[in-house]
Design a protein with these regions (language model features):
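Sequence-specific dsDNA recognition surfaces
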Residues: 31-43, 58-90
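Short, solvent-exposed loop/turn positions at domain surfaces
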Residues: 4, 40-41, 79-80, 110, ...
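Short, ligand-facing micro-motifs at secondary-structure edges
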Residues: 60-72, 91-117, 133-137, 146-150
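A short glycine-rich beta-alpha junction/loop motif
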Residues: 10-14, 41, 114-121, 130, ...
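BZIP DNA-binding basic region
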Residues: 4-10
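Non-catalytic DNA-recognition/assembly elements of restriction-modification systems
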Residues: 13-40, 167, 171
Length: 173
């Protein structure tokens, strides 16, 4: 059963939490948990066959990203697979959007099979200790979205880069 913190007013603790957790949440930047890298930009003749190719549409889709849910395909070299491949638990961020509200949206790759990600995507590779699915939902909270949108820049088209994502600070249990 969840514990209600509304009356206790403990600092930096969610109003409703599970009894297995105690103490305040700690602030950490995304760079403490993730190493960021921009995606692959292949020429058009390589698109349509080959390996699953994660795009913005896959990030925005409901649920997590799996090998079978990826919509696109691309022919990739072994070197490109090494450089732009995704691993189970990698977080993928939307790098560019026509609306500020969508810039930096995130999803998680939850599969062990080889796939690569595209140039309008930034991969967050795990370097810290976290649960990937928790991280996906944390990044979708109103506070996380507000902090992410603040890092977006642009007039008609909004972008966020690796540096902007690295600086986002969130609370972790």
């Amino acid at each position: 059963m969840a514990i209600d913190n509304k009356d206790k007013k403990v600092l930096n603790v969610p109003p409703l939490r599970f009894p297995e957790f105690s103490g305040e949440w700690e602030e950490h930047t995304l760079s403490e948990y993730l190493e960021f890298k921009n995606g692959l930009n292949p020429d058009a003749k390589r698109i349509g066959q080959g390996l699953p190719f994660i795009s913005v549409m896959d990030i925005l889709a409901e649920g997590v990203i799996t090998y079978n849910s990826i919509r696109g395909k691309v022919e990739a070299t072994d070197k490109e697979i090494d450089c732009f491949g995704v691993k189970n638990g990698d977080l993928l961020f939307q790098r560019s959007s026509e609306t500020l509200e969508d810039v930096g949206r995130a999803n998680v790759y939850m599969d062990s099979r080889t796939a690569v990600y595209g140039g309008f995507v930034i991969r967050g590779r795990k370097i810290g200790n976290y649960v990937p699915l928790f991280f996906k939902y944390l990044l979708a909270t109103p506070l996380a979205r507000k902090k992410t949108c603040r890092m977006g820049a642009g007039a008609q088209h909004f972008n966020i880069g690796q540096e902007g994502l690295s600086k986002i600070s969130l609370s972790f249990p």
